[in-house]
């Protein structure tokens, strides 16, 4: 059981954090859940809140901290987590490596995943993720719910005994280690000025809490973070090479690949990484989980359940995203990675067109509006009446010919602004109230 002395240690040794670089999105509510993919900067945003408070007013707990794991070892909250015979994994949060093993358990709800396979319906995969996680938890030894309740009860008693603490920060919360229902009960019974939680779980919701999705660095944010380049072309090259990981600008370029690979091996099993590699084939293309299963089956022992469960996990933890065709939610969705440099991390092969499309998708996510694809458009943002085409190397005159060909489709979609993203070309043409702007990447990325 977590002892008072253990909590006292963490209370007296809160993290020191300086030099925070503001992000486009920040905390606006005293009760906030920060969620996002690995290496998106969640811990940094959370710790920046701490830096503005008096030390005796805060309790900060990194739930992936090895020292905290030792403190709760008797309750075995972190025990019995395996990754299908792989060695224990360790979590790397935004500023340090801390253990968080992955779980690769058999899934009992085969029927639901099989129906998803037949229909190739990523919506069903998403709905099945809850069953995947719940069944994985059932494979663990002991009652995680009781251990979670004991853990949060100890924190509550410590807060009651130290009334000067008005702010609680829980970093790296994982539903693989703690019951969400226990966290909900715990949060509902507290009277704090601030309660901030960070997690990779996009489905974590608590009554009275605002939710802040933190994305990897946009190009604009990368420029603010990276101080090694001062010319726009070198900035673009560095961004495309290093990716949008929040810690990457502070790592020597030669060490970024090793760091990124360490993130993966620390948080995913060998089987999950193989599934990730297969996902690369579907970037900016119609996704099929069944094709991934078919590709892997001759090479490794794997079930459809494991494939669909892993896809559900990757989506829930914001590692992959799916893009629907407008007006046709049942159609196959396109896949994108939250970290657009995943191909270089996982393979020696390059595909600039797919990577560039993924880069632009990540930039558009920052607009916080619905995105779709259509037959004519790579990306369609109906709320902004905007369409986006990716044509990196064609001259403006050739692009304008395509603009004329799809003009009727743009009218039907009520698009008034067509953005054509290029690597270097530029130009503008307006026809019948619809404006086509050919923009170099940096102008497009910095225009929002």
Per-region residue spans from a language model:
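Accessory nucleic acid-recognition modules appended to NTPase machines
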Residues: 259-382
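N-terminal pre-Walker A segment at the start of P-loop NTPase domains
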Residues: 1-25
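Short glycine-rich substrate-engagement loop in P-loop NTPases that contacts/grips substrate
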Residues: 61-81, 118-121, 125-159
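Structural recognition of the conserved hydrophobic beta-strand(s) that form the central parallel beta-sheet
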Residues: 171, 192-200
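Walker A/P-loop nucleotide-binding motif
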Residues: 30-45
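Interdomain motor-coupling "hinge/lid" segment immediately C-terminal to the ATP-binding subdomain
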Residues: 199-285
